[in-house]
Amino acid sequence: MTKAEFSLVLPEVLLAIYAMGVLLFGVWTGKDRVAKPILWASAVTMLALALIIGLGTGNDTAFGGLFIADGFARFSKVVILVSAAAVLAMSSDYMGRRGLLRFEYPILIVLAVVGMMMMVSAGDLMSLYIGLELQSLALYVVAALRRDSAVSSEAGLKYFVLGSLSSGLLLYGASLVYGFAGTTTFSGIITVVEQGHLPIGLLFGLVFLLAGLAFKVSAVPFHMWTPDVYEGSPTPVTAFFATAPKLAAMALIARVVHDAFGQVPGEWGQILAALALASMYLGAIAGIGQRDIKRLMAYSSISHMGFGLLGLAAGTAAGVESMLLYMTIYIVMNVGTFAFILSMERDGKPVTEIAALNMLSKTDPVKAFALLVLLFSLAGVPPMLGFFAKFAVIKAAIGAGFVWVPVAAVVASVIGAFYYLRIVYFMYFGEKSAPLDGRMPALQFAFLVLAAVAMLGGAINMAGVEGAAQAAAASLVN
């Protein structure tokens, strides 16, 4: 390993060393008594690394192509690190007051983030699998963090069992690809794939690879775990599931299809378009009957991942750019929405029933309006930023020749808007009921308001995010 190669992986190495160091520190100094300092130290460490990575330049590889450090990886890592730090910060009060703030919690989040950083920089099937499993193993544990709850334990077990199945599918696909290509590096695989023609063995391998990765983004028909895990996990953990891991998996799909199978976009574009449509419609239709806001956010996530996959299905740099923009905006919307969900309490106990929001506009108009903005943005109502995110994805798909798919996407978006607008109806026109507690920690309130402001102001100026996404996409698709 040369000095140049080591410098490329330095952020991942530093974060891994930090995780192992604070794990030992926590064990030796009283475990949960140091949970809050570890949580805040972890958030600050990830923000510092995001700044360092964001200032990086160039497109390089390390370890014989196992690790790729390009603009696409840097953009994805910055968003992952910032979103993970935000979720940690806004979860401190919630976890502490419910006795869930154990010192392992922030460490598991950090280890999952290390795995995600490996995923977006993977240049080989082996590094892909290592990153994916590091993320998954940490998330299996954190889903069942509430050990005295049967629902939380069930969520963790269900996620583990189905996640193991998806890992098996991915490994089978990787073995097929290696068997027919004779190499595990993406740069080697793409030399085997002929322009416009994909050998049948590699096609089957690609299908199984995409099936394994589709599980991670909750794409239909690999979405079965999502509603139960979102509902059963502690709410801050659900917020984490809905943000950083989704971008990491989506970025990994983009890396695989463009770096390893970029010669045949027509083959995998059809697969991704089918997954996208199925996800959009199931998420939109199944969410209509939900009465629990965490389950509703699960189906919302499934539908939104369909739009992200539609951008990738285009098979162009514009498609990757639209996906990165969409996922970034989606993460901001979710951070703000979950900041509000964390504050939903009645008589000091958390509530997640949507009906609990009845006439919130009368008791807390500022929070109600901020949530209205975020819900309108999630629904894709102009002039909110969420509308422009969907517009960018649909425009990229039309530019790639998928005319009928964007039309179907618009219909799915209209159907899905119903359950967001139903929440707005409850807040402004619902029946009178026992009000929610007015308590909301200042940090959670700040995340809620800032996310709402971003959805309004971002339509005017995205503060350089659009240009950064364009440069990131150009570094991947060349």
Curated annotation (Swiss-Prot):
It comes from the Bacteria. It holds the Pfam family Proton_antipo_M. The keyword Transcription does not apply. The chain crosses the membrane at residues 8-28, 38-58, 62-82, 106-126, 160-180, 200-220, 234-254, 268-288, 300-320, 322-342, 368-388, 398-418, 445-465. Keywords: Membrane, NAD, Quinone, Translocase, Transmembrane, Transmembrane helix, Transport, Ubiquinone. Disruption phenotype: No functional NADH-quinone oxidoreductase complex. Cells lacking this gene have a nearly normal respiratory growth phenotype on lactate, however they are unable to perform anaerobic photosynthesis. It is suggested that in R.capsulatus this complex may function in reverse flow under physiological conditions. It is an enzyme of class 7 (translocase). One of its GO terms (molecular function) is NADH:ubiquinone reductase (non-electrogenic) activity. Its EC number is 7.1.1.-. NDH-1 shuttles electrons from NADH, via FMN and iron-sulfur (Fe-S) centers, to quinones in the respiratory chain. The immediate electron acceptor for the enzyme in this species is believed to be ubiquinone. Couples the redox reaction to proton translocation (for every two electrons transferred, four hydrogen ions are translocated across the cytoplasmic membrane), and thus conserves the redox energy in a proton gradient. Belongs to the complex I subunit 2 family. This is NADH-quinone oxidoreductase subunit N. The gene is nuoN.
